[in-house]
Every structure is written in C-alpha cells, then in structure tokens.
Design a protein with these regions (language model features):
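Phosphate/diphosphate ligand-binding glycine-rich loop within oxidoreductases
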Residues: 2-115, 228
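Short, conserved loop/helix-junction motifs that constitute active-site signature segments
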Residues: 3, 118-119, 141, 202-211
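Glycine-rich adenosine-cofactor-binding loop
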Residues: 11, 102, 112, 116-144, ...
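Helix N-cap at the beta1-alpha1 junction of Rossmann-like dinucleotide-binding domains, i.e.
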Residues: 14-15, 154-155, 220
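Conserved beta-strand positions in the Rossmann-like core of class I SAM-dependent methyltransferases
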Residues: 37, 147-148, 237
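Rossmann-like NAD(P)-binding element
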Residues: 153, 178-199, 214
Length: 237
C-alpha cells in the first residue's frame, strides 16, 4: 500500500512493549494507512533514528526505558510536561524541528491518580528512572504534599530534590521500610518485575493495609510486587 506512515517505539529492553499491538489494532480498525513497530535500540543508534524522523521516513517515535532523558540532547524543542520533567516519551517533526513531549504525566493522572487523588497527601516512590519525574509531577498536580523516594544508588535521587525542591524526601535504600510506613500510596517505577527482568521483592507485612500499591509495569499485568501487596490486603493498580 502506497504512502504508508511508519511509527516506532524504541527502548532497551523492548520485548515487553505492547505498543505495536495496541496502535496497529486501532490503525486497522479505523482503516488508517499506518504501521507501528518496536525496535531494540542502543544510545549510539538514536541519532540515526531521529535523522529518519527528520526525513519523514518515520512519522514519529515513542520512547521507553532507558532513553526518556538521554534523547533530549538530540531534540530541538520540548513542550508541556517534557519541559517540567526533563523526560520525553513522544517525538515528532513540526516545522522542520524535532519536538519532544511527555504523555506519561497525563496517562498516570488519568489512570491511577484519578482514582485515589482525593485522599492522597503522602507518597512513596521506588526507583530513579526516566519516568520517575513524570510520576512525581502527576502526584504534585493532584495535591500530594510529601513524596519519599528511594533507590539502591542514593546519589541518583539528587536530581529530583533539585528539580522539585521541598516536596521530595530522598531516603536511603536501607531506610525504605521505616519511612514508607507513613505513605498513602507506594509506586514502583523500576523495571524490576518486567517481562524478562528480575522480580522486585518487597516485604509488605509491616505496612498498613490502607496503603495503595502501584506498579507502572504492564507486562506482565500481575508482577511479584503486586501479588505480594495483595497477599497483605493492599488495593493494587
């Protein structure tokens, strides 16, 4: 078929991504002449991929781990929440400029946060990856006043403290159980538990069952993290 428009999601790993299945279903259902593929990518290959976007060989790309931050140096313009988070998951060409946007904030707000926002004032985050700043911004926009965040490499948390100031409370990995007791929602933003990755092991037995537990991983749908939370009586998303 002539003039087919091509779209792509890039990442590493990328096997877990269901984006092509979702997008191609709607393209076919609505008789839109487009195709969406996934590509395992290295940092060195990103510039070459973006050159294809500039040439309109690729109409646009989605970006997943671990490139949501590092791709920014290759772009001309950041818009909306991408400016606030320094995290990009969508790239396209507009007036000969490569534009980076962030739909992660909106997606998380419309999904999980919308269901629990009225009663959430304190949150805990596990992980310091490319989507972390998007989750933080979504929480702030919904009125969360205090966010504890932990990561095995403590130094990686400094960037979030610098960007979001007093609302962020970085905590050392060994202190996570003690300080997370005060949160109302606990969110895993690491890749642990993803298809092909190691599980995230977490002891929920010391936590109040009223704490909502979230895992941003969607493949598999039921991660070890969520299963363990449900065993302890937590509501999971």
């Amino acid at each position: 078929m002539k003039n087919k428009k091509n779209f792509l999601v890039i990442g590493n790993p990328i096997k877990h991504s269901l984006s092509p299945l979702l997008h191609n279903y709607w393209f076919h259902k609505n008789k839109i002449n487009c195709e969406y593929k996934k590509l395992k990518t290295t940092q060195a290959e990103i510039k070459k991929i973006l050159t294809k976007v500039r040439k309109k060989e690729i109409e646009g790309i989605n970006v997943t781990i671990p490139f949501k931050n590092s791709i920014i140096r290759h772009l001309d313009i950041l818009k909306g929440d991408a400016l606030k988070t320094s995290s990009v998951n969508t790239v396209y060409l507009n007036k000969k400029k490569l534009v980076g946007e962030n739909t992660d904030v909106y997606g998380f707000s419309c999904g999980v946060i919308k269901k629990v926002a009225n009663r959430i004032k304190t949150a805990g985050i596990i992980g310091a990856g490319g989507v972390t700043s998007s989750i933080i911004l979504a929480l702030i926009q919904k009125g969360v006043k205090k966010i504890y965040i932990t990561n095995r490499t403590f130094s990686k948390l400094k960037i979030f403290k610098k960007k979001f100031k007093k609302i962020i409370y970085p905590i050392k990995w060994n202190d996570r159980y003690k300080l997370f007791r005060d949160v109302q929602i606990l969110i895993n933003v690491t890749s642990l538990g993803m298809l092909g990755q190691k599980d995230l092991k977490f002891d929920f037995s010391i936590f109040d069952k009223k704490i909502n537990v979230v895992d941003i991983i969607y493949n598999p749908e039921n991660t070890r993290f969520l299963k363990d939370a449900r065993k302890n009586g937590h509501k999971t998303f």
